[in-house]
Amino acid sequence: MQKILNDPEPFVDEMLDGILAAHPDQLQRPSPRAIVRADAPVDGKVGIATGGGSGHLPVFMGYVGRGLIDGAAIGNVFASPSSDDMLDVTRAINGGKGVLYLYGNYGGDRLNFDLAAELAADEGIEVRTILGADDVASAPPDRASTRRGIAGIFFLYKVAGAAAAAGASLDEVVAVTQRAAAGTRTMGVALSPCTIPAAGRPTFELPIGQMEIGMGIHGEPGVRRGPLETADQIADELTSTILADLPYGRGDEVGVLVNGLGATPKEELYILYRAVAGILDGEGLRVHRVWVGEYATSLEMAGASLTLIRLDDELRSLLDAPAETPFFVQA
């Protein structure tokens, strides 16, 4: 294991120390594993809270800021934060209009955050929950509610955060974010594993020259493993799988996210998008906006994911709204 670290045990806390030291004007830390906006709570605004295990920057805390989310509970690498962490975030961002919990569909997170929501309710804070469940490889359509949440949660953060910043009520933020979630799908490919610092060994084995389609961001098994294919072939499989899962009509408008998993250069991501763009054009779909880069990673895993979101006028406007965090800026 070759990593820039001290003792693996305080890896997450030292990372948080560094982020807060670099961005004290944008972030504050009400408790050791809670990160919120520097100006939180924002009075009269719906608070947006998220959380999950470390190792996925900029997910989760990287989207804490203006026009996105208000706070994040931080767990150990690939491990759920505690209910106390999420309750600390909830208290710190409560501006009096309620709080939306928006996070990926994983068992540990659901258990701990449901408890946090109950404890917040006991304190008079209304909490609603939406789960990101965009990974089409993780379950068939008839079990879509059990799917994992991966890079598509970026679009949900963007929609919910923009709606809340515009003054929407909790019911309105929930409604538009649910609509965004219903039209968001992701499919990924892994080319190499990552290593959790405390474990000191790769999370899975994938020989050189092999790829795994549909692997999860924690190393969960995908749908197939085989020889590494060309960028065009990978793009075709990812795109066709997404379009088959949620059929789009000719003339529909979409947003596109090509996401690197941590060790894949942007050059390769753009080669992938080159092929995706041609496929979408051939299907008669109009691309409104494209995001290419690292939006939801898995430490140093090599690979990429493709996310499509089906747009309407309101979703388009919310995706285009300005946002600013230490990890993401959109004018």
Give residue ranges: language-model regions.
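N-terminal amphipathic/basic leader segments beginning at the initiator methionine
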Residues: 1-48, 313-331
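Short glycine-rich or small-residue beta-strand-to-loop segments that form or flank ligand, phosphate
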Residues: 2, 46-53, 69-72, 98-107, ...
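Glycine-rich oxoanion-binding loops at beta->alpha junctions
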Residues: 56, 65, 69-96, 243
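Short, acidic/small-residue loops that bind anionic groups at enzyme active sites
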Residues: 72-77, 121-146, 282-287
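Short Gly/Thr/Asp-enriched flexible loops that form oxyanion-binding sites at enzyme active sites
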Residues: 110-124, 143, 268-274
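Short alpha-helices
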Residues: 131-172, 176-183
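Mixed-charge interfacial surface used for oligomerization/domain docking
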Residues: 166-271
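C-terminal non-catalytic interaction/assembly regions of soluble proteins
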Residues: 241-331
